[in-house]
């Protein structure tokens, strides 16, 4: 029959049944050994001197990533939700099937890809169901009812 070892008390239990383990874990000796175990663990791990004794501490602690300057300057004028514009004569890398890296320049005999125009928001100047007659000045609109006149 396998014996149960209590890591907190550093003993083998004579009764390895679930009831025997439960009785041991509720005992005074086990609880005090468990408290002492965790207090010792906290003292050893959390109150250690810093690793960089005698040295200057690192400027950027943690997961600081160095900036990759090989990519060039950051792109300017790219709005969120819009793809950056490319020159029309350059095919993006990987767009040509069977040719790794794409082509270095324009393809002879093929017109360049047009650059899409940025979307200009259209502001409505008229309300729905409202027609304005530009030929008559100070005249009521076609859809409005006139309050002047014979009844």
Swiss-Prot record:
<dbReference type="GO" id="GO:0030619">
    <property type="term" value="F:U1 snRNA binding"/>
</dbReference>
<comment type="subunit">
    <text>U1 snRNP is composed of the 7 core Sm proteins B/B', D1, D2, D3, E, F and G that assemble in a heptameric protein ring on the Sm site of the small nuclear RNA to form the core snRNP, and at least 3 U1 snRNP-specific proteins U1-70K, U1-A and U1-C. U1-C interacts with U1 snRNA and the 5' splice-site region of the pre-mRNA.</text>
</comment>
<dbReference type="InterPro" id="IPR017340">
    <property type="entry name" value="U1_snRNP-C"/>
</dbReference>
<keyword id="KW-0479">Metal-binding</keyword>
<dbReference type="GO" id="GO:0030627">
    <property type="term" value="F:pre-mRNA 5'-splice site binding"/>
</dbReference>
<dbReference type="GO" id="GO:0005685">
    <property type="term" value="C:U1 snRNP"/>
</dbReference>
<dbReference type="InterPro" id="IPR036236">
    <property type="entry name" value="Znf_C2H2_sf"/>
</dbReference>
<dbReference type="Pfam" id="PF06220">
    <property type="entry name" value="zf-U1"/>
</dbReference>
<keyword id="KW-0862">Zinc</keyword>
<dbReference type="InterPro" id="IPR013085">
    <property type="entry name" value="U1-CZ_Znf_C2H2"/>
</dbReference>
<dbReference type="InterPro" id="IPR003604">
    <property type="entry name" value="Matrin/U1-like-C_Znf_C2H2"/>
</dbReference>
<dbReference type="GO" id="GO:0008270">
    <property type="term" value="F:zinc ion binding"/>
</dbReference>
<keyword id="KW-0687">Ribonucleoprotein</keyword>
<keyword id="KW-0539">Nucleus</keyword>
<dbReference type="GO" id="GO:0000243">
    <property type="term" value="C:commitment complex"/>
</dbReference>
<dbReference type="InterPro" id="IPR000690">
    <property type="entry name" value="Matrin/U1-C_Znf_C2H2"/>
</dbReference>
<comment type="similarity">
    <text>Belongs to the U1 small nuclear ribonucleoprotein C family.</text>
</comment>
<protein>
    <recommendedName>
        <fullName>U1 small nuclear ribonucleoprotein C</fullName>
    </recommendedName>
</protein>
<dbReference type="GO" id="GO:0003729">
    <property type="term" value="F:mRNA binding"/>
</dbReference>
<feature type="zinc finger region" description="Matrin-type">
    <location>
        <begin position="4"/>
        <end position="36"/>
    </location>
</feature>
<keyword id="KW-0694">RNA-binding</keyword>
<comment type="function">
    <text>Component of the spliceosomal U1 snRNP, which is essential for recognition of the pre-mRNA 5' splice-site and the subsequent assembly of the spliceosome. U1-C is directly involved in initial 5' splice-site recognition for both constitutive and regulated alternative splicing. The interaction with the 5' splice-site seems to precede base-pairing between the pre-mRNA and the U1 snRNA. Stimulates commitment or early (E) complex formation by stabilizing the base pairing of the 5' end of the U1 snRNA and the 5' splice-site region.</text>
</comment>
<dbReference type="GO" id="GO:0071004">
    <property type="term" value="C:U2-type prespliceosome"/>
</dbReference>
<dbReference type="GO" id="GO:0000387">
    <property type="term" value="P:spliceosomal snRNP assembly"/>
</dbReference>
<keyword id="KW-0863">Zinc-finger</keyword>
<dbReference type="GO" id="GO:0000395">
    <property type="term" value="P:mRNA 5'-splice site recognition"/>
</dbReference>
């Amino acid at each position: 029959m396998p014996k149960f070892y209590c890591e907190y008390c550093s003993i083998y239990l004579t009764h390895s049944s679930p009831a025997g383990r439960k009785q041991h874990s509720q005992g005074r000796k086990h609880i005090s050994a468990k408290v002492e175990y965790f207090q010792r663990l906290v003292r050893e791990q959390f109150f250690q001197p810093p690793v960089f004794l005698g040295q200057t501490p690192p400027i950027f602690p943690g997961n600081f990533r160095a900036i990759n300057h090989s990519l060039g300057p950051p792109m300017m004028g790219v709005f969120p939700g819009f793809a950056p514009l490319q020159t029309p004569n350059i095919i993006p890398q990987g767009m040509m099937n069977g040719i790794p890296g794409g082509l270095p320049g324009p393809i002879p005999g093929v017109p360049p890809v047009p650059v899409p125009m940025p979307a200009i928001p259209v502001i409505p100047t008229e309300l729905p169901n409202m027609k304005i007659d530009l030929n008559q000045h100070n005249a009521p609109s076609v859809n409005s009812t006139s309050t002047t006149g014979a009844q």
